[in-house]
Amino acid sequence: VSLPALGLVFATDPAPVLPPQQREQPRLITSRNRNPYSAVDVANALGCDAVRLGSAGAKAMAVVVGEADIYVHDGGMYQWDSAAPAAVALAAGLHVSRTDGSPMVFNERDPWLPDFLVCRQELAEPVLDALRASRRTR
């Protein structure tokens, strides 16, 4: 995953080292252009600070380097936008899944992925619980 504006490139080998959690309240990273209901619901349920940022790669890497703890995307994206960020996040030991908790599946005929979750392992169940509750109320 390349972040040219920061002069950074992330790969799976060597795997990034995930820093220890540094905040009392989790930080959720979301789209700079839109704030999906699911992200708002997770932020409210977990008492998260929310930060907006650009590309999917930049948001996922913010979790990898510890600038954020949760990235929820439910607006859909193509496999080529999420495959490398998912691989790097998994290599770093993060939780990566669809927002319903099912695994990400790549190399499908239809390249569209409706949603994406990257978070610290210890936050996966609370985030998925909040996402399930969000789906029930929408």
Residue ranges and their predicted role:
Residues 1-14:
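DPxDG-like acidic metal-binding loop motif
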Residues 22-138:
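An extended, acidic
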